Structures are given as structure tokens and as C-alpha cells.
Amino acid sequence: MSCFSHVMNPITGQNSWQERGDDYDYHLEVANAGFGDMLHDWERNQKYFAALRKTIAGMREAGREVHVLDIGTGTGILSMMALAAGADSVTACEAFLPMANCAEKILAANGAGDKVRLIRKRSTEIQVGEDMPRKANLLVAELLDTELIGEGAIGIYNHAHAELLTEDALCIPARARCYAQVAQSPLAAQWNSLKTIANLDGEPLLHPPEQLKSCQGEAALHDVQLSQLPSSAFRPLTDPVEIFQFDFQRKQEREKQRSQLLKLQSKQPGAAELVFYWWDIQLDDDGEILLSCAPYWAHPQLKELAAEKAKDHPLPNVVPWRDHWMQAIYYIPKPLQLLEAGKSFHLSCHHDEYSLWFDAREEAPTKSVRRHTCTCDLHMTYSRSRIGQLNQSPRNKRYLRYLEESIEAEKSNVLVLGNGCLLGLASSALGAASVLLHEPHRFSRRLIESIVKHNQLKNVQFLDKVEELEDSRLAALTHIFAEPYFLNAILPWDNFYFGTLLTKIKDRLPEGVKISPCSARIYALPVEFLDLHKIRAPVGSCEGFDLRLFDEMVERSAEQAVSLVEAQPLWEYPCRALSEPQEVLSVDFSNFGQEHSLKGSIELKHPRICNGVALWVDWQLVEDNSPRSIVSSGPSEPVVPGEFVKWDMFVRQGVHFPRRPKEAITHLEWSTVFKPLLGELTFSFGQKKL
């Protein structure tokens, strides 16, 4: 049976009805649940198993029976570990029904089907006596996220201790510790604030208005693979400090709100702009089995791991990799200038039931620091990567070079297409006679209007629909400009919506109008990821347990609900290039409606496993041979086969993960079909050994 879903096509900008199986949402949720990433986390699996063995053995030695509760069992892996470690009984709960049904089959396949009581409920809905025969005296759970408490761990543990666990119950993990490190990073700060846009001579063109300067931003975490932030891109102002402990084992309730005020001293001069955050967990009661989510420079086992892995891995990648628990950046509402080493200041740390926030001040605050929110529209409208992109100087210079060479003072009439296109707005400051901004998004327009007003730009008008432009206005246009960037875009080529907008006015444009970008090219690059491929790779077995049924479930769902190409910020996920990039599509925006069907083959120059294909767009601003006329969303430096690729840090690239990567392939075969008027762009890839 099928149903119809309302879907927005980012290339056409049209909503349409698409026929999908009535279980499409189920498949989408299964494919994106992220269980596979956790099961590939060998350190997590080994240490949970070790903690179960140690804890259950200790309870046995003390003459205690062991009755285990596994909250959020997923595949049932922790329940099977508990049985293997000698538990007398195991009760598991899983509220996500597709996963619970899969867990039931996995338990049976591993001979544990009649030994684990599986409850298809949230733990907060379980009744002792009705759902489980007795209270448990050992709780094992994985209820944590990058923020530690963002998935509701505080409330779940409080309920479990009150209703489901004995007075003397033990917990795995037993406790957690949260850490903060204050730092300055001009690069990371670009993800949080808007800089002045200057011309090629450094003279200001657009100043951010006061409401942007005074805005404290959003308190929400910015989760990143912090180990991949170049060491040259930040200045640590303090050592890591412990800010909170969470005792999961104590019977007393865990507080839902706490504050911690720390008096710190700066190690060196700088601006306290941001807080790096991570946590570790002690899985056993003695605190001997430790799992740390620290970035490499603060990892407690860095020396041992470097000695073991440094030959094959860059230093930032010797620590265990995981994508379900990363690190986070929190931005200080008002950066604090610390002018000398040894300068004292106060770090104010806060958490509620689900989140954290921070502030840094010279003097201790006299009252509690409230969680801050955006008041300027920038942070609530744009993603972190888009804010950073607006500040990206090398990229902006290429656009500004084109505009400075192309705009004629008092003569040029410019139509700007895209959301939040400050570079297009800069053409007004460069002297254009008139600037029309296509800005239909409410909050984005409100932000741009504030910038127009603050910079006293008199020749700027806004429009909602390009097709409603009068013929006389279109006939007067000398330039059409875009970055392009649209809020609905996820993959780089979703911004081909620029071409769709052009087709709506193409027949009414004057013959000599200059369109920039004039064309775009998509490139493909076969790569070998160190780790990212694990989010889609089959698990097979984990700690001796057969999880092939889980692999089959995820693969079936992925085939029905996951695009062959997904968006990822590749600067966070190191990969080696296996060849030079190859063009797989070229689009001319003056003839955007033309359909394309292409195929080719890429010869691999480096003998490794191709477990991914990276794709991106190069925008050609003007038809010349200068590399300065190209703005790329891909590598930021030339690609060298066999070497790690350095990626643009302010945009997500496209990635294709082969279902079953083959060893020793020599060629990657590809095909591209593009039907622009339908908004259909499809890629297919095949691995071949010649």
C-alpha cells in the first residue's frame, strides 16, 4: 500500500506530492537512528562489556543475585553482554518499535530469546509487577549524547531509582564528569558573529548593525569533531577544568538545575570567546574503567594511543572515533578580553534538565546567569556553517573581485538572488545605481533590512517573487548576481535553484545582462575515510554477538529512504584522495533547462579501499581562465592522490557510501542524470577491477 507525501524540491522550489510506501517514515527513522555508529565504537563496546563482567562478578562474590535492567536496549547488545557476564535475569526496554522488533529477533538468533524479558515501552512507563517481576539491582544504559544530558538522562535516572531499582542498585555507567576549556579562536568565532565586509583594499563596505553586535547569540551547543580543528586555529586560555559531576548511582535525585562558578587564570593573553566542552564516564563503581570523549590534546590515554597508532594515523585521529558522542563549542555571550597571562576571571557554568550554557566575566556575577537567546535574527535564521561562510574572507574576496571589476558606479542595476546575500548587497556600497534583493524569507529579510538601514543604503529594494518584476525593471538590469545560497539547500547542488529562478525571467532579460555565476561544475572524488564510512557500514558481529539481522534491517530501510548522496561537513572526517577529482556535470545558467545524461570512469591512483565518494560544486563567476573566478565548495587546497584532503570548513559536501566496498578496485564508474525542470539530479557509482 502507498501514500502520498508533500515534499519540497530544493532545485525547483516547488512542493509536490510523491508516492511513497506507507512504511516510508519507519524506514527513514530506522536508517537515520544512528545505532550502527554506536556498534562500530569498539571502545564503548569493550568497556561496557568489561564493566558488566567486573560488576556482576563483584555482586556474585558478595552473595547477591543479579537482576539487570537495560534501558534503551537498541539491538539488545548490552542485555546479551549482561547474560554472558552471568546475570540471573535481564529485563530490556525499547520504545522505538522497529528497533524493539529487531532486538527480539537478534536475541533469539543469539540464543537469548527466552532469557531476556523485552518490554516495548519507555522506561518511565514501566510498572514493577506488571511489566517486570521485581526491581532490578543493576542498571545498564546508554542514555547520553554529546551534551550528556540532552536526551533526558536526568529524568530517566531519577525515575528509575524511584520506581524500578532497589535501594542498593548499581549503575553502568556509575558517574560522569563534564569538562570545559576556555579558548580564543578567530576561526571558530566566525561561526557565531558577523564581521564587517570590506573591499579588496580593506575599506569597509557593510558594517553589522548594533543589534548584531549586542546580540548574545544562541546558547545551543555547536557539536563538532573538535580534534579536527587545526591546532593553529585556536589559543587555549585555560587548561581543561571539571565543571559538573553526575552520579548516576546515587539514590538521591539528580538536580535538574545547577550552577557552578569557577575562578580561573588565563595561561596566556587572549579573548575568552568560547568554551570547548566534553565529558567522560566511569563505567564501574571503582572508576577504573574510564571512557573519555576528550579531544586528542586532552585525552588521558594520548601517549599510549599515539605509540600504538601514530604510524598510520595523524595525531588527532589516534584517539577512539565516535560520531554519537562528539565534543561541543559553546560561545561566550560577550567575549572577555584577558590582556595578560595570569589574569583572573570567572567562568559561570549552568545546566538545566537538558542543556548547558556558559558565561565569562571579570567579576563574579551577583545573580544567576540566564540562558541567552538570539535577538538579532542572524543566529535563529542561519546555520553555524552559513554564518561562518558569510565571514569567509578568501571566498568573499573572489566575489568582491568580480563585483568591483564589473559594477559601474551610477550605471549598474543589479538583481540579487538568494537568502542573506550580503555580497550582493555590497554592490550597493560599490556604487550600483539600484539593487533588487530577492528575499522572500521573513527573518532573513528582516536581518538584511536592518543592515541596509544601518549602512544608510538608499538604492535597495526587496522583492518576494522574481516573476512579478515589471518588464521595465527587467529591461534595465545590467547584472544578476548570486553566491548562490538558499535556506532550503542541504546538498551543494540544491543551490541550483538559482537556475530555476533565472528560467522564470529568462525570456524578458536584456541581451547583454551579466549573470554570475555563469556556470557550475560538480566534481567527484573517490576517497578512503578513516572513520566516517562506519555510519553506513554493516556491523556483522560485535563482541562475539551476531548482529547481521540488524544490518539487514538497516540496509532494507536505507535502500528505501536514504539518498544515495548525503551531506556531511568533511573537514571533520579525514579521508585520503584515491585519484584526482573528475567533473561529472557542468551546468550553464544561461541555458539551465538543458537536460544532461553523462557517464565515465575514474582511475584510482592509490591502492586503498574506496569507502566513499565525495562530491561538491565549483561556481564559475565569470568565463575566464583565472582560478580566482572559481568559488569551490570542495577542497580548499589542491588534491594529491594518497594524501589527506583539506576541505572547506564552512559548507557541507555530498558523500556517497558504497554499500559493500571492494578491495583493490582500479576504477570507479559513474553516471549522472540531470533533469533541471523536474529538479531531478541522480548519481550512480560502481566499483570495478580491470
UniProtKB/Swiss-Prot annotation:
Catalytic EC class: transferase
Recorded phenotype for the gene knockout or disruption: Death at pupal stage.
Entry keyword set: Methyltransferase, Repeat, S-adenosyl-L-methionine, Transferase
SUPFAM superfamilies listed in its UniProt record: S-adenosyl-L-methionine-dependent methyltransferases
Domain SAM-dependent MTase PRMT-type, first and last residues per copy: 14-357, 366-690
GO BP of this protein: chromatin remodeling; peptidyl-arginine methylation; regulation of DNA-templated transcription
GO molecular function ontology, one term from the record: protein-arginine omega-N symmetric methyltransferase activity
Transmembrane segments: none
EC number(s) recorded for this UniProt protein: 2.1.1.-
InterPro entries: Arg_MeTrfase (IPR025799), MeTrfase_PRMT7 (IPR014644), PRMT_dom (IPR055135), SAM-dependent_MTases_sf (IPR029063)
Presence of keyword Kinase: no
Tissue expr: Expressed at low level in ovary.
Function recorded in the entry: Essential arginine methyltransferase that can both catalyze the formation of omega-N monomethylarginine (MMA) and symmetrical dimethylarginine (sDMA). Specifically mediates the symmetrical dimethylation of arginine residues in the small nuclear ribonucleoproteins SmD1 and SmD3.
Protein family membership: Belongs to the class I-like SAM-binding methyltransferase superfamily. Protein arginine N-methyltransferase family. PRMT7 subfamily.
Name the UniProt record assigns to this protein: Protein arginine N-methyltransferase 7
